[in-house]
Protein backbone atom coordinates (compact mmCIF):
# COMPACT_ATOMS: atom_id res chain seq x y z
CA UNK A 1 0.00 0.00 0.00
CA UNK A 2 2.93 2.31 0.69
CA UNK A 3 6.73 2.28 0.58
CA UNK A 4 7.08 1.63 4.30
CA UNK A 5 7.79 -1.78 5.84
CA UNK A 6 4.63 -3.78 6.58
CA UNK A 7 5.87 -4.36 10.14
CA UNK A 8 6.13 -0.63 10.80
CA UNK A 9 2.74 0.07 9.24
CA UNK A 10 1.14 -2.65 11.37
CA UNK A 11 2.63 -1.28 14.60
CA UNK A 12 1.58 2.29 13.88
CA UNK A 13 -1.78 1.27 12.41
CA UNK A 14 -1.08 3.65 9.57
CA UNK A 15 -3.84 2.24 7.34
CA UNK A 16 -7.48 1.84 8.26
CA UNK A 17 -9.39 -1.43 7.94
CA UNK A 18 -11.31 0.07 5.02
CA UNK A 19 -8.03 0.96 3.29
CA UNK A 20 -6.70 -2.56 3.82
CA UNK A 21 -9.87 -4.18 2.52
CA UNK A 22 -9.86 -1.88 -0.50
CA UNK A 23 -6.24 -2.82 -1.28
CA UNK A 24 -7.00 -6.54 -0.93
CA UNK A 25 -9.98 -6.16 -3.25
CA UNK A 26 -7.88 -4.27 -5.81
CA UNK A 27 -5.12 -6.87 -5.83
CA UNK A 28 -7.61 -9.74 -6.02
CA UNK A 29 -9.21 -8.09 -9.05
CA UNK A 30 -5.82 -7.70 -10.68
CA UNK A 31 -4.84 -11.31 -10.15
CA UNK A 32 -8.22 -12.64 -11.28
CA UNK A 33 -8.05 -10.54 -14.45
CA UNK A 34 -4.47 -11.67 -15.11
CA UNK A 35 -5.48 -15.31 -14.74
CA UNK A 36 -8.43 -14.83 -17.10
CA UNK A 37 -6.20 -13.33 -19.78
CA UNK A 38 -3.54 -16.02 -19.29
CA UNK A 39 -6.14 -18.74 -19.77
CA UNK A 40 -7.39 -17.13 -22.99
CA UNK A 41 -3.80 -16.88 -24.28
CA UNK A 42 -3.12 -20.51 -23.38
CA UNK A 43 -6.33 -21.68 -25.06
CA UNK A 44 -5.45 -19.68 -28.19
CA UNK A 45 -2.09 -21.47 -28.46
CA UNK A 46 -3.76 -24.84 -27.96
CA UNK A 47 -6.51 -24.12 -30.49
CA UNK A 48 -3.96 -23.01 -33.09
CA UNK A 49 -1.80 -26.10 -32.51
CA UNK A 50 -4.72 -28.53 -32.76
CA UNK A 51 -6.31 -26.93 -35.82
CA UNK A 52 -6.13 -29.56 -38.58
CA UNK A 53 -5.10 -29.55 -41.38
CA UNK A 54 -2.61 -26.67 -41.49
CA UNK A 55 -0.31 -26.46 -44.54
CA UNK A 56 3.30 -27.19 -43.59
CA UNK A 57 2.57 -26.86 -39.87
CA UNK A 58 2.33 -29.29 -36.98
CA UNK A 59 -1.24 -30.45 -36.38
CA UNK A 60 -3.09 -33.53 -35.12
CA UNK A 61 -2.51 -35.42 -38.38
CA UNK A 62 1.21 -34.90 -39.01
CA UNK A 63 4.24 -32.82 -38.08
CA UNK A 64 4.16 -30.75 -41.25
CA UNK A 65 7.61 -29.74 -42.45
CA UNK A 66 9.15 -30.38 -39.02
CA UNK A 67 11.16 -33.36 -37.85
CA UNK A 68 11.91 -32.12 -34.33
CA UNK A 69 8.43 -31.40 -32.97
CA UNK A 70 4.91 -32.80 -32.73
CA UNK A 71 1.52 -31.71 -31.44
CA UNK A 72 2.42 -32.86 -27.92
CA UNK A 73 5.55 -30.67 -28.07
CA UNK A 74 3.35 -27.63 -28.69
CA UNK A 75 0.92 -28.64 -25.97
CA UNK A 76 3.68 -29.04 -23.39
CA UNK A 77 5.14 -25.70 -24.46
CA UNK A 78 1.79 -23.94 -24.03
CA UNK A 79 1.41 -25.40 -20.53
CA UNK A 80 4.87 -24.13 -19.59
CA UNK A 81 4.09 -20.64 -20.90
CA UNK A 82 0.72 -20.13 -19.23
CA UNK A 83 2.09 -18.79 -15.89
CA UNK A 84 4.19 -16.26 -17.78
CA UNK A 85 1.13 -14.80 -19.48
CA UNK A 86 -0.23 -14.08 -15.99
CA UNK A 87 3.05 -12.39 -15.10
CA UNK A 88 3.02 -10.26 -18.27
CA UNK A 89 -0.44 -8.93 -17.39
CA UNK A 90 0.66 -8.20 -13.83
CA UNK A 91 3.77 -6.48 -15.20
CA UNK A 92 1.52 -4.26 -17.30
CA UNK A 93 -0.44 -3.37 -14.18
CA UNK A 94 2.68 -2.67 -12.11
CA UNK A 95 4.27 -0.45 -14.77
CA UNK A 96 1.15 1.49 -15.69
CA UNK A 97 2.72 4.84 -14.75
CA UNK A 98 5.92 4.30 -16.72
CA UNK A 99 6.31 5.87 -20.19
CA UNK A 100 5.47 3.56 -23.10
CA UNK A 101 9.07 3.71 -24.25
CA UNK A 102 10.28 2.06 -21.01
CA UNK A 103 8.04 -1.01 -21.17
CA UNK A 104 9.95 -3.17 -23.65
CA UNK A 105 13.12 -3.15 -21.56
CA UNK A 106 11.05 -3.97 -18.46
CA UNK A 107 9.38 -7.06 -19.92
CA UNK A 108 12.32 -8.44 -21.90
CA UNK A 109 13.78 -10.33 -18.90
CA UNK A 110 10.40 -12.00 -18.34
CA UNK A 111 10.27 -12.92 -22.03
CA UNK A 112 13.70 -14.55 -21.77
CA UNK A 113 12.53 -16.51 -18.72
CA UNK A 114 9.51 -17.68 -20.71
CA UNK A 115 11.80 -18.80 -23.55
CA UNK A 116 13.91 -20.84 -21.13
CA UNK A 117 10.79 -22.49 -19.71
CA UNK A 118 9.71 -23.31 -23.27
CA UNK A 119 13.07 -24.88 -24.09
CA UNK A 120 13.00 -26.97 -20.91
CA UNK A 121 9.47 -28.20 -21.72
CA UNK A 122 10.32 -29.04 -25.35
CA UNK A 123 13.83 -30.43 -24.94
CA UNK A 124 15.37 -27.35 -26.60
CA UNK A 125 12.88 -27.08 -29.49
CA UNK A 126 11.66 -23.59 -30.48
CA UNK A 127 7.90 -23.96 -30.58
CA UNK A 128 6.64 -20.56 -29.43
CA UNK A 129 9.42 -17.96 -29.48
CA UNK A 130 7.43 -15.69 -31.78
CA UNK A 131 4.27 -16.23 -29.75
CA UNK A 132 6.08 -15.31 -26.52
CA UNK A 133 7.08 -12.00 -28.12
CA UNK A 134 3.59 -11.19 -29.43
CA UNK A 135 1.55 -12.44 -26.48
CA UNK A 136 3.96 -10.92 -23.97
CA UNK A 137 3.41 -7.50 -25.49
CA UNK A 138 -0.36 -7.90 -25.78
CA UNK A 139 -0.78 -9.25 -22.24
CA UNK A 140 1.31 -6.37 -20.89
CA UNK A 141 -0.83 -3.88 -22.82
CA UNK A 142 -3.99 -5.45 -21.40
CA UNK A 143 -2.61 -5.16 -17.88
CA UNK A 144 -1.80 -1.50 -18.47
CA UNK A 145 -5.35 -0.74 -19.60
CA UNK A 146 -6.89 -2.74 -16.77
CA UNK A 147 -4.88 -0.79 -14.20
CA UNK A 148 -5.97 2.50 -15.71
CA UNK A 149 -9.58 1.33 -15.60
CA UNK A 150 -9.16 0.47 -11.90
CA UNK A 151 -8.06 4.05 -11.25
CA UNK A 152 -11.35 5.25 -12.79
CA UNK A 153 -13.65 2.64 -11.25
CA UNK A 154 -16.17 5.16 -9.98
CA UNK A 155 -17.14 6.09 -13.54
CA UNK A 156 -17.09 2.58 -15.04
CA UNK A 157 -18.72 -0.43 -13.33
CA UNK A 158 -16.79 -3.14 -15.18
CA UNK A 159 -13.76 -3.64 -17.39
CA UNK A 160 -14.39 -5.18 -20.78
CA UNK A 161 -12.97 -5.17 -24.27
CA UNK A 162 -15.31 -3.42 -26.70
CA UNK A 163 -17.66 -5.83 -28.44
CA UNK A 164 -16.45 -4.49 -31.79
CA UNK A 165 -12.84 -4.18 -32.96
CA UNK A 166 -12.27 -0.84 -31.19
CA UNK A 167 -10.82 -2.54 -28.12
CA UNK A 168 -8.52 -4.69 -30.22
CA UNK A 169 -7.28 -1.58 -32.03
CA UNK A 170 -6.65 0.13 -28.69
CA UNK A 171 -4.53 -2.76 -27.40
CA UNK A 172 -2.66 -3.00 -30.71
CA UNK A 173 -1.92 0.73 -30.69
CA UNK A 174 -0.50 0.36 -27.18
CA UNK A 175 1.80 -2.43 -28.38
CA UNK A 176 2.92 -0.19 -31.24
CA UNK A 177 3.89 2.49 -28.73
CA UNK A 178 5.73 -0.07 -26.59
CA UNK A 179 7.78 -1.19 -29.59
CA UNK A 180 8.34 2.10 -31.41
CA UNK A 181 11.81 1.96 -32.96
CA UNK A 182 12.30 -1.78 -32.42
CA UNK A 183 13.08 -2.34 -36.10
CA UNK A 184 16.05 0.00 -35.67
CA UNK A 185 17.76 -3.10 -34.27
CA UNK A 186 17.69 -4.40 -37.85
CA UNK A 187 18.55 -1.12 -39.55
CA UNK A 188 21.44 -0.20 -37.25
CA UNK A 189 23.04 -3.62 -37.21
CA UNK A 190 26.72 -3.58 -36.32
CA UNK A 191 29.09 -5.68 -38.42
CA UNK A 192 30.72 -6.82 -35.19
CA UNK A 193 27.51 -8.55 -34.08
CA UNK A 194 26.58 -12.14 -35.03
CA UNK A 195 24.65 -12.31 -38.30
CA UNK A 196 21.23 -13.73 -37.40
CA UNK A 197 18.61 -15.06 -39.82
CA UNK A 198 16.43 -12.00 -39.13
CA UNK A 199 19.26 -9.59 -39.95
CA UNK A 200 20.12 -11.49 -43.13
CA UNK A 201 16.52 -11.42 -44.40
CA UNK A 202 16.21 -7.72 -43.61
CA UNK A 203 19.41 -6.97 -45.52
CA UNK A 204 18.30 -9.05 -48.51
CA UNK A 205 14.59 -8.24 -48.73
CA UNK A 206 13.77 -5.53 -46.19
CA UNK A 207 11.52 -7.90 -44.24
CA UNK A 208 11.14 -6.82 -40.60
CA UNK A 209 9.38 -9.98 -39.40
CA UNK A 210 7.78 -10.12 -35.96
CA UNK A 211 9.43 -6.85 -34.91
CA UNK A 212 7.83 -4.94 -37.76
CA UNK A 213 4.40 -6.46 -37.22
CA UNK A 214 4.44 -5.48 -33.53
CA UNK A 215 5.83 -2.00 -34.23
CA UNK A 216 2.92 -1.35 -36.60
CA UNK A 217 0.35 -2.66 -34.09
CA UNK A 218 -0.29 -6.08 -35.67
CA UNK A 219 -2.07 -4.79 -38.80
CA UNK A 220 -2.32 -8.26 -40.36
CA UNK A 221 -3.98 -9.67 -37.27
CA UNK A 222 -6.42 -6.76 -37.14
CA UNK A 223 -7.20 -7.30 -40.82
CA UNK A 224 -7.70 -11.04 -40.24
CA UNK A 225 -10.14 -10.28 -37.42
CA UNK A 226 -12.14 -7.94 -39.66
CA UNK A 227 -12.04 -10.53 -42.46
CA UNK A 228 -13.46 -13.22 -40.17
CA UNK A 229 -16.15 -10.94 -38.76
CA UNK A 230 -17.21 -10.00 -42.29
CA UNK A 231 -17.97 -13.64 -43.07
CA UNK A 232 -20.96 -15.67 -41.90
CA UNK A 233 -20.40 -17.45 -38.58
CA UNK A 234 -18.72 -20.76 -39.38
CA UNK A 235 -16.56 -23.42 -37.75
CA UNK A 236 -14.21 -22.93 -40.73
CA UNK A 237 -13.34 -19.35 -39.81
CA UNK A 238 -9.91 -20.24 -38.37
CA UNK A 239 -8.93 -21.87 -41.67
CA UNK A 240 -10.02 -18.73 -43.49
CA UNK A 241 -7.94 -16.64 -41.08
CA UNK A 242 -4.88 -18.84 -41.60
CA UNK A 243 -5.18 -18.60 -45.38
CA UNK A 244 -5.63 -14.83 -45.13
CA UNK A 245 -2.48 -14.50 -43.05
CA UNK A 246 -0.46 -16.83 -45.28
CA UNK A 247 -1.56 -14.88 -48.35
CA UNK A 248 -0.52 -11.51 -46.94
CA UNK A 249 2.33 -12.14 -44.49
CA UNK A 250 5.95 -11.82 -45.63
CA UNK A 251 6.73 -14.77 -43.38
CA UNK A 252 10.44 -14.87 -42.63
CA UNK A 253 10.12 -18.50 -41.49
CA UNK A 254 9.20 -19.43 -45.05
CA UNK A 255 11.92 -17.30 -46.64
CA UNK A 256 14.51 -18.82 -44.32
CA UNK A 257 13.55 -22.30 -45.55
CA UNK A 258 12.60 -21.73 -49.16
CA UNK A 259 13.82 -18.31 -50.21
CA UNK A 260 11.69 -15.69 -51.90
CA UNK A 261 10.34 -18.31 -54.33
CA UNK A 262 9.04 -20.35 -51.41
CA UNK A 263 7.26 -17.30 -50.03
CA UNK A 264 5.75 -16.53 -53.42
CA UNK A 265 4.47 -20.10 -53.69
CA UNK A 266 2.81 -19.95 -50.26
CA UNK A 267 1.21 -16.57 -50.90
CA UNK A 268 -0.04 -17.53 -54.37
CA UNK A 269 -1.54 -20.82 -53.18
CA UNK A 270 -3.23 -19.16 -50.20
CA UNK A 271 -4.63 -16.37 -52.41
CA UNK A 272 -5.94 -18.97 -54.86
CA UNK A 273 -7.84 -20.76 -52.12
CA UNK A 274 -9.23 -17.56 -50.65
CA UNK A 275 -10.56 -16.63 -54.07
CA UNK A 276 -12.37 -19.95 -54.47
CA UNK A 277 -15.85 -19.43 -53.03
CA UNK A 278 -16.55 -23.17 -53.12
CA UNK A 279 -13.49 -23.82 -50.96
CA UNK A 280 -14.50 -21.21 -48.41
CA UNK A 281 -18.12 -22.27 -48.03
CA UNK A 282 -17.90 -26.06 -48.40
CA UNK A 283 -16.18 -27.78 -45.48
CA UNK A 284 -15.28 -30.95 -47.40
CA UNK A 285 -13.84 -29.01 -50.33
CA UNK A 286 -11.86 -26.75 -48.00
CA UNK A 287 -10.41 -29.69 -46.06
CA UNK A 288 -9.39 -31.47 -49.25
CA UNK A 289 -7.78 -28.31 -50.61
CA UNK A 290 -5.87 -27.70 -47.36
CA UNK A 291 -4.61 -31.29 -47.27
CA UNK A 292 -3.32 -30.88 -50.83
CA UNK A 293 -1.67 -27.60 -49.81
CA UNK A 294 -0.15 -29.36 -46.80
CA UNK A 295 1.37 -32.07 -48.99
CA UNK A 296 2.87 -29.44 -51.30
CA UNK A 297 4.38 -27.51 -48.37
CA UNK A 298 5.89 -30.65 -46.87
CA UNK A 299 7.36 -31.64 -50.24
CA UNK A 300 9.01 -28.19 -50.43
CA UNK A 301 9.96 -28.18 -46.72
CA UNK A 302 8.03 -24.94 -46.17
CA UNK A 303 6.47 -23.97 -42.84
CA UNK A 304 4.52 -20.71 -42.33
CA UNK A 305 5.45 -20.49 -38.65
CA UNK A 306 5.11 -16.71 -38.53
CA UNK A 307 1.55 -16.93 -39.80
CA UNK A 308 0.83 -19.62 -37.19
CA UNK A 309 1.87 -17.18 -34.44
CA UNK A 310 -0.36 -14.50 -35.94
CA UNK A 311 -3.25 -16.99 -36.17
CA UNK A 312 -2.91 -17.74 -32.44
CA UNK A 313 -3.05 -14.00 -31.75
CA UNK A 314 -6.10 -13.69 -34.03
CA UNK A 315 -7.84 -16.45 -32.07
CA UNK A 316 -6.92 -14.67 -28.84
CA UNK A 317 -8.26 -11.31 -30.02
CA UNK A 318 -11.54 -12.90 -31.11
CA UNK A 319 -11.85 -14.61 -27.73
CA UNK A 320 -11.51 -11.20 -26.05
CA UNK A 321 -14.55 -10.01 -27.98
CA UNK A 322 -16.69 -12.88 -26.76
CA UNK A 323 -15.41 -13.45 -23.20
Swiss-Prot record:
Keywords in alphabetical order: ATP-binding, Nucleotide-binding, Transferase
Keyword Nucleotide-binding appears in the UniProt entry: yes
Name the record gives this protein: 2-(5''-triphosphoribosyl)-3'-dephosphocoenzyme-A synthase
Source organism per UniProt: Haemophilus ducreyi (strain 35000HP / ATCC 700724)
Transmembrane feature ranges: none
Record-stated family: Belongs to the CitG/MdcB family.
Keyword presence, Metal-binding: no
Underlying gene: citG
Known function: Catalyzes the formation of 2-(5''-triphosphoribosyl)-3'-dephosphocoenzyme-A, the precursor of the prosthetic group of the holo-acyl carrier protein (gamma chain) of citrate lyase, from ATP and dephospho-CoA.
GO MF entry, a single one: ATP binding
Alphabetized PANTHER family for the sequence: 2-(5''-TRIPHOSPHORIBOSYL)-3'-DEPHOSPHOCOENZYME-A SYNTHASE (PTHR30201:SF2), TRIPHOSPHORIBOSYL-DEPHOSPHO-COA SYNTHASE (PTHR30201)
EC category: transferase
Catalytic activity: 3'-dephospho-CoA + ATP = 2'-(5''-triphospho-alpha-D-ribosyl)-3'-dephospho-CoA + adenine
GO BP annotation list: prosthetic group biosynthetic process
E.C. code: 2.4.2.52
